[in-house]
C-alpha cells in the first residue's frame, strides 16, 4: 500500500509541475494577494501545520502579509480574510461572487452529494432549501414552539447538578452541558429522546472530524488516484452510511406516527420536513436523502456550537470572579423567590448583563473560527487584487474578533465593552461576525442562543461555582481543541454549591 501511495504522490507531483509550467506560459499574470513562500507540490501547508489550530497560524501569517492573503493548500488556491474591511468586501460587496461553498470530497459524501443547505451549491435548489429552513425550521415562531422542551431539559440538567452538589462532588461541566444541549436538540429535531441518539451522535462526531481533516485527497482534488486511496473518503462513506441508516429508521417511525395521528410527532423539525415532503406545490423535490442532509446540517451546526458557547461562557465567568458575581447578582435579583426559571421569566426580566456575557463569549470564542469556507464562483477583483474562479475562501472571524485595532484589551473577557453599543451578531457589523454575514450567514443563530440563555441563567441562579482544591481562576485552561468547532480543549471541572435548590431536587 505504501508503494502505491508513493507512486501516486510522485505521479501527482509530475502532473502538478507540468500543469504549472503550462499555466505560466498560457495564462496572463494575475495580481494575486500576497502570501508566504511556497514549496513545490504542498504549497503553503507547512506554514499552517506548524500550529494545530489553523486560525491562529493564519492570524500570525496575516500580520506579515495583510488582511487579504493567498495560500496554496496543495493545488487549492485559498484566500484568507482577516479584517472587517476585507470581510465586508467578501460577504457584502462581492457576496454573489463568493456565494458558493468550497466542498471537498469528504463533505460532498457526508451531505449526499451536496443536497443540503449549509454546503449546497449556490443556485435555485439552495435558495429554496434556505427559504424553507428560515421560514419553517428556524423561524421565531418555530424556536418559540420549543419552549417547553428547553424548560424541561434545563430543569433536568439543574436536578442532576443539584444531586452532585448535595453529594459534594465535582462535575465535568463541559460534558454535562454537551449532554444537555444534545438532549434538547434531539427533542427539537426528532420530537422525543431517541433510542438511536447515542449511535447517531457518535457517527455525527466522526463525520465532523473527518470533514475538518486536511487529507491528501482534499488538497489534490484533481487526482482520482489519491481520492481512491484516501482514508478520509472511506471514513466519510462509513459515517454517512451509518447516519443514513439511523435517520432512515427515524424517518420511517416518524411517518408511521404521523399517519396514526400522533400530535406529538408533528412538533419536531423532522416532522415539518416530512409534512412538506407531501406538498405537491413545493418548488423542489424533498426526497428522504434531502431530509437526511438537512438533518445533518441541523445537528452539526446546532448542537456543537450551542454547547461550545455555553461552556465558554461558564469558563470565562469562572476565570473572572468579579464578572461572575455581577452576572449572578443580576439574575438572582430578577428572579428572587423563585424555585425555577422559565423562558417567560426571561422575556419579562431585563437581563442586560447576561446578554452581554453571551455576546462577549461569542466574540472571544467564535464557535466556528474560520466560518465555513466559501468558493469564488467567478473571477473578480477584491480590494485591488485578482481572485481566480474556484478559490477557496476562509474568513478568519476569530482573528477579526481579537484584533486590537477594533477591540480594546482584545484578549480579555469584558462584557462591559458592549454596553452602550448597538453591535449584534446579525451580520452587519463586520468586526463582529460570530455567525458570519451575507447569503451564507448561519440561519440558526436565534435557535442556538435560545438553547443556551435559559441554561446559563439557571446555572448562575441556582449554584455558586468553585474550582477544585488548589486551582486559581487564572489556572483555568482556555486553549481550544483542534477541529471545525472551537471546543474547549480540557474539560471544565467545577464543584457546584447549591444556592437556591431547583424544584424536585
Curated annotation (Swiss-Prot):
Record-listed heme binding positions: 442
Coiled coil: none
Enzymatic reactions: (S)-beta-macrocarpene + 3 reduced [NADPH--hemoprotein reductase] + 3 O2 = zealexin A1 + 3 oxidized [NADPH--hemoprotein reductase] + 4 H2O + 4 H(+)
Name of the protein: Zealexin A1 synthase
Any one annotated GO CC term: membrane
PANTHER family: 4-HYDROXYPHENYLACETALDEHYDE OXIME MONOOXYGENASE, CYTOCHROME P450 FAMILY 71 PROTEIN
Entry membrane topology: Single-pass membrane protein
A family per Pfam: p450
Cofactor: heme
Organism ancestry: Eukaryota, Viridiplantae, Streptophyta, Embryophyta, Tracheophyta
GO molecular function terms noted in the UniProt entry: heme binding; iron ion binding; oxidoreductase activity, acting on paired donors, with incorporation or reduction of molecular oxygen, NAD(P)H as one donor, and incorporation of one atom of oxygen; terpene synthase activity
Keyword set, alphabetical order: Heme, Iron, Membrane, Metal-binding, Monooxygenase, Oxidoreductase, Plant defense, Transmembrane, Transmembrane helix
Recorded superkingdom: Eukaryota
Keyword Transmembrane assigned: yes
The protein's role, per its UniProt record: Involved in production of the antifungal phytoalexin zealexin A1. The enzyme sequentially oxidizes(S)-beta-macrocarpene via alcohol and aldehyde intermediates to form zealexin A1, a maize phytoalexin that provides biochemical protection against fungal infection.
The enzyme's E.C. designation: 1.14.14.160
InterPro entries: Cyt_P450 (IPR001128), Cyt_P450_CS (IPR017972), Cyt_P450_E_grp-I (IPR002401), Cyt_P450_sf (IPR036396)
UniProt-listed Gene3D superfamilies: Cytochrome P450
Flavoprotein is among the record's keywords: no
Family from the record: Belongs to the cytochrome P450 family.
Location(s), subcellular: Membrane
Native species: Zea mays
